[in-house]
């Protein structure tokens, strides 16, 4: 399931609720997944933790996203696989490399 784009109930940062939205699976465990939030609200300034995927990106069609979106690697969550509502697409190798580069640069732990 890693590198798949799924629909999940992604929690709000204050844990007051959640919203069904697309997310990128960045790790799959036995019962849980770690996902990165995907938003169609493109910020005026892209952060170092963001990956913008525009409709003209060569890998856009495979993602299953409907409009240009941003993957927010500063908004990740570990969620039960039971919260996944469905799979809408996947990340092809070139786009996966872009994701890995951003995660490596951003987390530098």
Segments (PLM) and residue ranges:
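Compact nucleic-acid interaction/catalytic patches
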Residues: 16-19, 25-56
């Amino acid at each position: 399931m890693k590198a798949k784009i799924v629909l999940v109930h992604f929690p709000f940062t204050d844990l007051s609720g959640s919203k069904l939205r697309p997310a990128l699976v960045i790790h799959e465990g036995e019962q849980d997944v770690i996902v990165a939030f995907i938003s169609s609200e493109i910020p005026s300034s892209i952060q170092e933790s963001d990956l913008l995927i525009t409709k003209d990106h060569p890998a856009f069609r495979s993602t299953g996203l409907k409009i240009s979106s941003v993957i927010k690697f500063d908004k990740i969550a570990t969620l039960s696989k039971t919260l996944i509502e469905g799979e809408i697409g996947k990340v092809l190798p070139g786009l996966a490399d872009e994701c890995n580069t951003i995660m490596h640069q951003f987390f530098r732990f």
